UniProtKB/Swiss-Prot annotation:
Region of interest (Tail), residue spans: 397-431
Lineage: Eukaryota, Metazoa, Chordata, Craniata, Vertebrata
Pfam families reported for this sequence: Filament
Residues at the site labelled Stutter: A338
Domain of life of the native organism: Eukaryota
Example of a GO biological process term: intermediate filament organization
Positions of region (Head): 1-89
S-S bonds: none
Organism: Bos taurus (Bovine)
Record-given protein name: Keratin, type I cytoskeletal 40
Subunit comment: Heterotetramer of two type I and two type II keratins.
Any one cellular-component term (Gene Ontology): intermediate filament
Location of the region described as Coil 1B in the Swiss-Prot/TrEMBL record: 136-236
GO molecular function, one term: structural molecule activity
Length: 431
């Protein structure tokens, strides 16, 4: 499409078409202030064939990233005729300059803030001493030793409990034996007391018999004396007056008979005495032997009972000592557990503090990353605006040496850079 760039060639029809195109192609740019979102433009760029020249009255508007609802109309024939910017281009340049200055100030402030934050982080990292976990291996070894001692003490307590049970059973057996022996002793003592009663009765009987024998001896002596007296009296009365010889049986000798009776009684008495003494001696010997054996058994039982009592006392003392040792070990274990629990709580508090610091550092890093992304987006928008600004400056530099469209020098080649700039501006501004 060829267009006439002369002043007289710009007819009212082309002016109306240019104004309508400018109004129809007014660029409304919407920017979203998101960190990762790039500025989007609602500018609809008309498509033109490559190498085609646009009419001067209907140039597409230049869309600038970051400008909100700012009409940027580029392509009025006034700049070709007058060689200066119109009011819209001046306002756009002023707006871009203000935006560039504000962005530069923001970038400078953010760089200073970033440097300050880096210095603070570096100082904080230098000040923070790395947390070194203390070595608790010695405490763990002590705990293991105490646990081994507790296990050994428990085993020893079990062994002592078994021995104590065995001693109790043995003591019960000896107690039953002692009771049986005591009952036997009581029976033997009862028999001895009965035999002693019989012995007393026999002694009384013996004394009675001895008294009876003595009385019989006295009677015999009295009889002998009375017989001798009677014989003497008779012999004295008879004298020598009468001598009578009788052929009769010989008279018995009373003395001899009495002697024989005395001998028989004495023999029987001696035999009875000997038998009684032998029986008494045998019974006494047997009772003495039983008493000695019972005394020996009783002494042995008493000795065993004393030994068992001594052993039971010793075991009870050892049990009390082991119980006290176990209680002390349990107290020590409880104190150790409490101490380790407090230390673990302190360590957990330190870990929580470090985790909170790490979380704060992560939040700071995330915030800085977000700010960095925002800065990158801002930088991209600034670069886009700078490119647009540079394009406008280049276009201004390219337009300044050109004369307004004269009737003699205006041709198709003269407007070629303008149309190329407009196409380049549209391609760079509205991708």
């Amino acid at each position: 499409m060829a267009s006439d760039c002369s002043p007289t060639g710009c007819s009212s029809e082309s002016s109306a078409r240019a104004s309508d195109c400018a109004l129809a192609s007014t660029c409304s740019v919407e920017t979203t202030c998101l960190p990762s979102a790039c500025a989007t433009s609602s500018c609809q760029t008309p498509s033109f064939p490559s190498g085609a020249r646009l009419p001067t009255g209907c140039l597409p508007p230049a869309c600038f990233a970051g400008s909100c609802n700012i009409p940027c109309v580029v392509g009025n024939c006034a700049w070709c005729e007058d060689g200066v910017f119109n009011s819209n281009e001046k306002e756009t340049m002023q707006f871009l300059n203000d935006r560039l200055a504000s962005y530069l100030e923001k970038v400078r402030g953010l760089e200073e803030l970033n440097a300050e934050l880096e210095c603070r982080i570096r100082e904080q990292c230098e000040e923070d001493v790395p947390l070194v976990c203390p070595d608790y291996q010695c405490y763990f070894d002590t705990i293991e030793d105490l646990q081994q001692k507790i296990l050994c003490t428990k085993a020893e307590n079990c062994r002592l409990a078994v021995q104590l049970d065995n001693c109790k059973l043995a003591a019960d057996d000896f107690r039953s034996k002692y009771e049986s022996e005591l009952s036997l002793r009581q029976l033997v003592e009862t028999d001895i007391s009965g035999l002693r009663g019989i012995l007393g009765e026999l002694t009384v009987c013996r004394s009675d018999l001895e008294a009876h024998v003595e009385s019989l001896k006295d009677d015999l002596l009295c009889l002998k004396k009375s017989h001798e007296e009677e014989v003497n009296v008779l012999r004295g009365q008879l004298g020598d007056r009468l001598s009578v010889e009788l052929d009769t049986a010989p008279t018995t000798d009373l003395n001899r008979v009495l002697d024989e009776m005395r001998c028989q009684y004495e023999t029987v008495l001696a035999n009875n005495r000997r038998d009684v003494e032998e029986w008494f001696a045998a019974q006494t010997e047997e009772l003495n032997q039983q008493q000695l054996s019972s005394a020996e058994q009783l002494q042995g039982c008493q000795t065993e009972i004393l030994e068992l009592k001594r052993t039971a006392n010793t075991l009870e003392i050892e049990l009390q000592a082991q119980q006290s040792l176990t209680e002390s070990l349990e107290c020590t274990v409880a104190e150790t557990e409490a101490q380790y629990s407090s230390e673990l709580a302190q360590i957990q508090c330190l870990i929580d503090n470090v985790e909170n610091q790490l979380a704060e550092i992560r939040c700071d890093l995330e915030r800085q990353n977000q700010e960095y992304r925002v800065l990158l987006d801002t930088k991209a928008r600034l670069e886009c605006e700078i490119n647009t600004y540079q394009g406008l400056l280049d276009s201004e530099d390219s337009r300044l040496p050109c004369n307004p469209c004269s009737a003699t020098s205006m041709s198709n080649d003269t407007c070629e850079p303008c149309s190329a700039y407009v196409i380049c501006t549209v391609e760079n501004s509205c991708p």
